[in-house]
Amino acid sequence: HAFADTFYGNRARVPDLEAVATAVFSYPNVGTVGLTEAEAVAKYGHVRVYNSTYTPLKCHVGQAHLDIKERSKDYMKILVDTATDKVVGIHVITDNAGELMQGFACAIKCGVTKAQMDLTIGIHPTAAEELVTMRTAKYEATKEGVTKL
């Protein structure tokens, strides 16, 4: 809308590109919205990092013949500015990541905090549920380095 508002609506606007969701439709999909960890540390200085690698429920059933270590894995990561508790980045590797990122792009654009995500009841069983049930940060990143928690 920034283009249309600027050129046709006489309301100059600059698009906010930090909350644009993107996806790579590979198998599995890769989805991202917000800042990368390096960008978040550069901008905010101190970032709390939540991440999870897990086997989706469908793989427990569909890949039951495989050893647990051989089953498909998904990965999700949430970046949080420690000063404000604001979620500044979400990155996922999972089926349908593109679909998943659109809703979280709206949340990041609206300034969602980690506390608000923690209050959300996830739809079970979905990949999105994993993002709202990550309660324990794995590490904190600063310009000086990483501290495991």
Question: What do the PLM-derived regions correspond to, one by one?
Answer:
Residues 1-17, 85, 126-127:
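Rossmann-like dinucleotide/flavin-binding elements
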Residues 12-29:
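Flexible, acidic loop-helix segments that line cofactor/substrate-binding pockets
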Residues 1-4, 21, 36-37:
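A general structural signal for well-ordered alpha-helical packing
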Residues 25-36, 41-149:
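Flexible, glycine-rich terminal cap/loop adjacent to redox cofactors
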